[in-house]
Amino acid sequence: GVDTLELEVGYGLVRLVGGDLLDRIAMIRHQLASELGLVMPPVRIRDNMQLPPDRYRLKIRGATIDEGEVHPELLMAMDSGLAAGKLEGIPGVEPAFGLDATWIDPALRMRAETQNSTVVDPTSVIATHLTEVVRRHADELLTREEVGNLVEQLKQSAARLVEEVVPAQ
């Protein structure tokens, strides 16, 4: 079967997956469950040798929803709107919100933060992008099975309501 939610990574990003990305995804699932009441489906992560090494792709039921690029050895500095001065690095785009960004050497982190840039690691970039894709496509992730689970949970606290609204089978 096709996975509901999938993250494909280029070979340059494989070691990020082995790092704290899995922990971050677990935190996102917890956060979205309390925020949206939606239990995010498990994320299938696979490497895709057809992708350029630093690119990743987010898919829902096999359809590509969005892509992004991160530099695993660098940090992303985003202009908070108040940034003073230009940072040396590789120009880029923060993929979740489309903000201009610069990929900088980790040694420049303090300077970037002193100049009012927001600095994040590549794992955070992917995690934030995934979170926003799930938020924007929550309706597509709400399966019949998921609705059934929500109804079962509701039976615990509001059995009468469920009896009135859901036809007996």
Question: Which functions belong to the PLM regions below?
Answer:
Residues 1-169:
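Membrane-embedded alpha-helical signal segments
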